[in-house]
């Protein structure tokens, strides 16, 4: 009560921010007559004038009124469009490192030109981020004439572009691209082997369109660049055959409940749990299939990977549904984005889940991948010096934007008052009754010539509604992940009189629905339209537009509530743009996922008590309140998941930054010999310490062990025992110095043969490759640690603190391994003259031919039998190069049969 009273007196924070900015809007408006007097050349010259002023130390902020006035005037001349005052406010909000909530149809694309131009004046580059390639290309091409008129270059960053084209796009003043592509380019740049391979500049200013979709909906999905791991597709197929034998039970076994099934599903947490009965059956089936030995347990350490396969297969069958979570197209399983309804080509689920779904659907199973580099959007966008975003629905997530990204949300008022009617929800008992009511509503609306947009939450639901509409003889368009190619065209014409469009989730976001349809789309469809044709198209459109306005504007039907209120608001926001009339209504049933999982049982109890007859709907504030509470519950849970993900990823992020900084420094120098010399000292000190403890008695020294270690790991033959026998005065300190000096001398002799320049190049390559290899292994180890760390909670330990502690220890160990591996590799390198290499190659070819002849005579030749036996053993188990050779010769595999294979 008191807060409301204070807000009335002093205004909300939002009001105060807008009040401050309106003063600047007045200044911009006052400059308009002055700008109108300038010639085109004088207006264009303003850009160089602003750049010169910034060069002399003037701040970008001080240029706001003048720069915005210049962009507004240029837009009038180039597009014939003048920025509204609310768009100027939006531009200032975006420049202020804030999120601008601007309703659908308020011209966010044109608003973005203001802060993009202003921040590009510094010459550091501006990245405009969109949700898909179509919008990136459309916005770049639409705004290019304006920016080029003002002397600014525009680049488009699309997937699959060659590196030189990408470098050129990033070098432009303003670059348009998708969130995925910017993130992947960052990861690829940090895997480059030369500075010339990198494409990005320093990350300066990011302007994110549909910021809620990118920074919230996709925050749980990390960007991963991966390489192939071992092939285990056969195992997925075998385990997949077993899963259909299992029966699902309603809930998990407990002290009070013992079910008859084999597994239970927790829909809320999206987890599957095997029951005792299920575990016994799975083990029996695995033994029958010959995958596991009799008497073995699925939980024994040797069967960890098998358990992983079973869990993945069970999740694929119980939690992931075709045409809801994924589609199958051209023999490939493609993920469907749960928030936008779009397909995510090229994205794959991790932890073997994607392979399990492929096995379930009977398509070709692609190899599992190993992570080479990864980053979350949360951490990528926090790398920018300056970040801002815009969307039609941000206010419900303002707390998350503030706590995670330190971005305030400012609600920008609409240019004209909103007059859309949001009708109360109607709740039915069954899904069938609800669908029937939706069909009746559509019939009624279209009979009056009112266009209808039906929003569904999955492809499956959109197809159910489509079938019912077809039965009822109602012509309609379907827009979902299966038909997204003609997305913009369908959305543009969704405002036609009596048009019915079914859209999955928010597919088609970013394209305005114009009442009466889009006359621009009709003109674009003609090859060379004449002035008369264009005038006729506009006149026809005006008639349709007026008819739709008279019918009540666009009507929105939601077939069920989404988990997030924000996505419901996005659907509603498609109607009532720029002060147009419109209406919206959500139809729900007690069988909807949200109602079933999260809304309390009281709602269904209340409906039964009211004695509702089939086909009747309930419309009551209590029900609406229960639904809103259910949505809040889900939003809060999803926020906690994202926050927790970020807290864990922050640990990896600190390490990632350290590694990438080190790697970039390494890339930018041509001579790393000082670093090599420094780490050589550290490595030899640590190696000697293991066999000659510092300040210890000679009796404690392990000289044979040290000699063997130096030979095996550094290819150094050092008669240390002989030195000590011949030189009694040789003590610990001088011995250490001699070992190090000898290693340096051997290394320098190699350098003399190949030349200093070649050696420097080789050193740098070894350091980069070793760093990448160990970082890849470290990422895999961090993944394993992350998956099991929650179990520490049972030991009364904080899993987050344990994760931080262990991952730091692993990181420190990785850095030590890096030093050791680099020095070991450089020490072992064999320098050969060209003629020696040729002779060795000849010898290798002769041995290969001899081996081929031996294998042809294998039934007569014992030696070939050994080779065949060896091949069988290596097929079962991968033999390391330094392992003993299975033929029994006593030699290492690489020096015996490994050399022949």
Curated annotation (Swiss-Prot):
Pfam families: P-loop_SecA, SEC-C, SecA_DEAD, SecA_PP_bind, SecA_SW. Its cofactor is Zn(2+). Its EC number is 7.4.2.8. Keywords: ATP-binding, Cell inner membrane, Cell membrane, Cytoplasm, Membrane, Metal-binding, Nucleotide-binding, Protein transport, Translocase, Translocation, Transport, Zinc. Gene3D superfamilies: Helical scaffold and wing domains of SecA, P-loop containing nucleotide triphosphate hydrolases, SecA, preprotein cross-linking domain. Zn(2+) binds at residues 885, 887, 896-897. It comes from the Bacteria. GO terms for molecular function: ATP binding; metal ion binding; protein-exporting ATPase activity. It is a peripheral membrane protein. ATP binds at residues 87, 105-109, 512. SUPFAM superfamilies: Helical scaffold and wing domains of SecA, P-loop containing nucleoside triphosphate hydrolases, Pre-protein crosslinking domain of SecA. PROSITE patterns: SECA, SECA_MOTOR_DEAD. It catalyses: ATP + H2O + cellular proteinSide 1 = ADP + phosphate + cellular proteinSide 2. It is found in: Cell inner membrane; Cytoplasm. Induction: Repressed under conditions of excess protein secretion capacity and derepressed when protein secretion becomes limiting. This is regulated by SecM. Coiled coil: none annotated. Its main location: membrane. Belongs to the SecA family. NCBIfam families: PRK12904.1 (NF009538), secA (TIGR00963). Monomer and homodimer. Part of the essential Sec protein translocation apparatus which comprises SecA, SecYEG and auxiliary proteins SecDF-YajC and YidC. Part of the Sec protein translocase complex. Interacts with the SecYEG preprotein conducting channel. Has a central role in coupling the hydrolysis of ATP to the transfer of proteins into and across the cell membrane, serving both as a receptor for the preprotein-SecB complex and as an ATP-driven molecular motor driving the stepwise translocation of polypeptide chains across the membrane. This is Protein translocase subunit SecA. The gene is secA.
């Amino acid at each position: 009560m008191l807060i409301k009273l204070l807000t009335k007196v002093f205004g909300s924070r939002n009001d105060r921010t807008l009040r401050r900015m309106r003063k600047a809007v007045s200044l911009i408006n006052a400059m308009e007559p002055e700008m109108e007097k300038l010639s085109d050349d004088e207006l264009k010259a303003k850009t160089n004038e602003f750049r010169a002023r910034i060069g002399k130390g003037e701040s970008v902020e001080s240029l706001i009124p003048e720069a915005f006035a210049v962009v507004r005037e240029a837009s009038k001349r180039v597009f014939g469009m003048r920025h509204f005052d609310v768009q100027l406010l939006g531009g200032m909000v975006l420049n202020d490192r804030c999120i601008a909530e601007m309703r659908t149809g308020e011209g966010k694309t044109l608003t973005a030109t203001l802060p993009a131009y202003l921040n590009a004046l510094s010459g550091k580059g501006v990245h405009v981020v969109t949700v898909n390639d179509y919008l990136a290309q459309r916005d770049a091409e639409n705004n290019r004439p304006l920016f080029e008129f003002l002397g600014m270059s525009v680049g488009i960053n699309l997937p699959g572009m060659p590196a030189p084209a990408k470098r050129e796009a990033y070098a432009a003043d303003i670059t348009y691209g998708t969130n995925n592509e910017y993130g992947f380019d960052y990861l690829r740049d940090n895997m480059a082997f030369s500075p010339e391979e990198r494409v990005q500049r320093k990350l300066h200013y990011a302007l994110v369109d549909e910021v809620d979709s990118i920074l919230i909906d996709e925050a749980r999905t990390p960007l991963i660049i991966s390489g192939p791991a071992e092939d285990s597709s056969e195992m997925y197929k075998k385990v997949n055959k077993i899963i259909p034998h299992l029966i699902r039970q309603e809930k998990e076994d407990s002290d009070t409940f013992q079910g008859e099934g084999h597994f239970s599903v927790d829909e809320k947490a999206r987890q599957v749990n095997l029951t005792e009965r299920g575990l016994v059956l799975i083990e029996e089936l695995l033994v029958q299939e010959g995958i596991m030995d009799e008497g073995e347990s699925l939980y024994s350490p040797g069967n960890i990977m098998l358990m992983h396969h079973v869990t993945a297969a069970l999740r694929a069958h119980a939690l992931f549904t075709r045409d809801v979570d994924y589609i199958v197209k051209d023999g490939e399983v493609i993920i469907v984005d749960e928030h936008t309804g779009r397909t995510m080509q090229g994205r794959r689920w991790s932890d073997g889940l994607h392979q399990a779904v492929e096995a379930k659907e009977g398509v070709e199973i692609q190899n599992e991948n190993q992570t080479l580099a990864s980053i979350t959007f949360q951490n990528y966008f926090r790398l920018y010096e300056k970040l801002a975003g815009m969307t039609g629905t941000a206010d419900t997530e303002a707390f998350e934007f503030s706590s995670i990204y330190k971005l305030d949300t400012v609600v920008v008022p609409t240019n004209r008052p909103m007059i859309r009617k949001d009708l109360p929800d109607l709740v039915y008992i069954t899904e069938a009754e609800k669908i029937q009511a939706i069909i009746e509503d559509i019939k009624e609306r279209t009979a009056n010539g009112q266009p209808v947009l039906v929003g569904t939450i999955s492809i499956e639901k959109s197809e159910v509604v489509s079938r019912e509409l077809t039965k009822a003889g109602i012509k309609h368009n379907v827009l979902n992940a299966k038909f997204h190619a003609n997305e913009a065209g369908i959305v543009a014409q969704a405002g036609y009189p009596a048009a019915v469009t079914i859209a999955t989730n928010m597919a088609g976001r970013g394209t305005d629905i114009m009442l009466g349809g889009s006359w621009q789309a009709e003109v674009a469809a003609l090859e060379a339209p004449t002035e008369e044709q264009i005038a006729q198209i506009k006149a026809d459109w005006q008639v349709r537009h007026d008819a739709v306005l008279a019918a009540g504007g666009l009507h929105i039907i939601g077939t069920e509530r989404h988990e997030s209120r924000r996505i419901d608001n996005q659907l509603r926001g498609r109607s009532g743009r720029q002060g147009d009339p419109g209406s919206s209504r959500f139809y729900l049933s007690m069988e909807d996922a949200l109602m079933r999982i999260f809304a309390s049982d009281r709602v269904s109890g209340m409906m039964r008590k009211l004695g509702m007859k089939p086909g009747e709907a309930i419309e009551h504030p209590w029900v609406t309140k229960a639904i809103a509470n259910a949505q809040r519950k889900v939003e809060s849970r999803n926020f906690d998941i994202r926050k927790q993900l970020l807290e864990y990823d922050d640990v990896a992020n600190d390490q990632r930054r350290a590694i990438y900084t080190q790697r970039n420094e390494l890339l930018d120098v041509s001579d790393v010999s000082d670093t090599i010399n420094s780490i050589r000292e550290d490595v030899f000190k640590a190696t000697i310490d293991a066999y000659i403890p510092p300040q210890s008695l000679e009796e404690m020294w392990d000289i044979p062990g040290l000699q063997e270690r130096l030979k095996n790991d550094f290819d150094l033959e050092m008669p240390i025992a002989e030195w000590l026998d011949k030189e009694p005065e040789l003590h610990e300190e001088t011995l250490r110095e001699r070992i190090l000096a000898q290693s340096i001398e051997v290394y320098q002799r190699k350098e003399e043969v190949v030349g200093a320049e070649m050696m420097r190049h080789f050193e740098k390559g070894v350091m980069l490759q070793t760093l990448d290899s160990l970082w890849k292994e470290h990422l895999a180890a961090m993944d394993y640690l992350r998956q099991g760390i929650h179990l520490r909670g049972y030991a009364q330990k904080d899993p987050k603190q344990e994760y931080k502690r262990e991952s730091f220890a692993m990181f420190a160990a990785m850095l030590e391994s890096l030093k050791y591996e680099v020095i070991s590799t450089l020490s072992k390198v064999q320098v050969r003259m060209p003629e020696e290499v040729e002779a060795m190659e000849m010898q290798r070819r002769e041995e290969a031919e001899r081996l081929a002849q031996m294998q042809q005579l294998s039934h007569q030749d014992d030696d070939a039998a050994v080779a065949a036996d060896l091949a069988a053993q290596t097929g079962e188990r991968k033999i390391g190069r330094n392992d003993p050779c299975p033929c029994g010769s006593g030699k290492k595999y690489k020096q015996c049969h490994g050399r022949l294979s």
